[in-house]
Amino acid sequence: MNSIDPRAIIDPSAKLADGVEVGPWSIVGPDVEIGEGTVIGPHVVLKGPTRIGKHNRIYQFSSIGEDTPDLKYKGEPTRLVIGDHNVIREGVTIHRGTVQDRAETTLGDHNLIMAYAHIGHDSVIGNHCILVNNTALAGHVHVGDWAILSGFTLVHQYCHIGAHAFSGMGTAIGKDVPAFVTVFGSPAEARSMNFEGMRRRGFSDEVIHALRRSYKIVYRQGLTVEEAVKELDELAGKHPEVDLFRQSIVNSARGITR
């Protein structure tokens, strides 16, 4: 059974599964779907086409699924897709996609999006990510699983943040960040790898040692990117985690943060 505050506005075309809660003065617009057990707080605006999965919680003053401010956007049908078990805190803004890219913005599962963060059009956020307060992603940004972006991190459009990467507070990211790499500063510079995150997630000492060696190859031996990638081949063949690091470098379109 749903719990809809009488002061909320629900469009007749919106689809709400069982167990959905909607707080006072929230607006659920046309072509919005909300999955089972999701809780929408007060003063939330949901605009479609937007699909929200199960057991999410969205806090007050968030604007979810609004049109992109991209000047190329002319009202074409685009959408936002949000997975399951996400927490979206106060004042978060997430825009739908554009037809010039995927026509979709995607947020995966088990993410924590903290207060006043922004996720721009056509961005893709993986699973188990944390975007700390006031983090802002421009359009077309990709964030890999388990990445953590500290408060006031800014990410340039089209940048890719690799899985398990970490940014320090106030970091300005203008190039791709390889998987596992920790970056700080404005502009961002690579400082180390997210070894603390690896330990918390149960990575073995052997894997952590291999990743430490891999980081030194790329960042400490004075090699070109092409030379470093070749040097990583042997370790990547032994450890999938090193291969993930290597592939995030190989697939970089903007160049990697160094």
Curated annotation (Swiss-Prot):
GO cellular component: cytoplasm; membrane
Pathways per UniProt: Glycolipid biosynthesis; lipid IV(A) biosynthesis; lipid IV(A) from (3R)-3-hydroxytetradecanoyl-[acyl-carrier-protein] and UDP-N-acetyl-alpha-D-glucosamine: step 1/6
GO molecular function: acyl-[acyl-carrier-protein]-UDP-N-acetylglucosamine O-acyltransferase activity
CDD domains (alphabetical): LbH_UDP-GlcNAc_AT
Top-rank EC class of the record's enzyme: transferase
Residue runs in coiled coils: none
EC number in record: 2.3.1.129
This protein's UniProt keywords: Acyltransferase, Cytoplasm, Lipid A biosynthesis, Lipid biosynthesis, Lipid metabolism, Repeat, Transferase
Source organism, top-level taxon: Bacteria
Pfam families (alphabetical): Acetyltransf_11, Hexapep
One Gene Ontology term from the biological process aspect of the record: lipid A biosynthetic process
Catalytic activity: a (3R)-hydroxyacyl-[ACP] + UDP-N-acetyl-alpha-D-glucosamine = a UDP-3-O-[(3R)-3-hydroxyacyl]-N-acetyl-alpha-D-glucosamine + holo-[ACP]
Cellular localization per UniProt: Cytoplasm
Function: Involved in the biosynthesis of lipid A, a phosphorylated glycolipid that anchors the lipopolysaccharide to the outer membrane of the cell.
Name by which UniProt lists this protein: Acyl-[acyl-carrier-protein]--UDP-N-acetylglucosamine O-acyltransferase
Source organism: Pseudomonas putida (strain W619)
Gene symbol of the encoding locus: lpxA
